[in-house]
Amino acid sequence: MLSIESLCKSYRHHEAVKNVSFHVNENECVALLGPNGAGKTTTLQMLAGLLSPTSGTIKLLGEKKLDRRLIGYLPQYPAFYSWMTANEFLTFAGRLSGLSKRKCQEKIGEMLEFVGLHEAAHKRIGGYSGGMKQRLGLAQALLHKPKFLILDEPVSALDPTGRFEVLDMMRELKKHMAVLFSTHVLHDAEQVCDQVVIMKNGEISWKGELQELKQQQQTNVFTLSVKEKLEGWLEEKPYVSAIVYKNPSQAVFELPDIHAGRSLLSDCIRKGLTVTRFEQKTESLEDVYLKVVHA
């Protein structure tokens, strides 16, 4: 769907984006993560055709020349004419994107229904809450049925209920198009994304599948629970270190690798212990993200 190779953007003596390369596949949701100033918004604006890259290649559906009719874009702070109603604004936006008046009216009702604003279609935008404006921006980005949707911090201004609803919309949208979104809300990325791209100082620090990222950054911390008493016996194992007992039958500790975990389970069986829980600590995306950006 989208291929980015060696993308760079410079402003005089400042390199905002340095040699960025990644791919977004059809019906895939990719999260672009990174601290403030990492180059996320600049990258998204180049992909949307709003900024020209200093160098590098962007291909959409194999074509170097971006067809902006195939792209939907929601900026972090969407701007509206406050005196317009949602219906008027979407008609205006649709006509600018080349839709006929009749087609606009057909699509507007559908989009307002999808984003949950159908009851506010004739209310002036100046009276909208921040969350309602974000939804209207999403409706505008989807009006012309793009193949590739770019969302810059789409849930940053929303309350928990609004955030959940927008994430639910994103899950539905990726069935029909490719989605690339930036966010600081790492838990939200964990809910909807297939791939992650982590940027730092204008460069990519890591990219790939979320599960692969977690596995690469995983610690060797394990939890073991048994019906019997662990205390005293566990210390005898030379491959077990940093033991912390939650209670006499449950402990958290470190092992050098998963093979040591298998050895420990074998020792438990030989000892006649009844294992009720044995698991390796799974890190959240936030834990992994902090490791990558502070590396």
UniProtKB/Swiss-Prot annotation:
Induction: Expression is sigma Y-dependent. Induced upon nitrogen starvation. Residues 2-226 form the ABC transporter domain. PROSITE patterns: ABC_TRANSPORTER_1, ABC_TRANSPORTER_2. The keyword Transport applies. It is an enzyme of class 7 (translocase). ATP binds at residues 34-41. Belongs to the ABC transporter superfamily. This is Uncharacterized ABC transporter ATP-binding protein YxlF. It comes from Bacillus subtilis (strain 168).
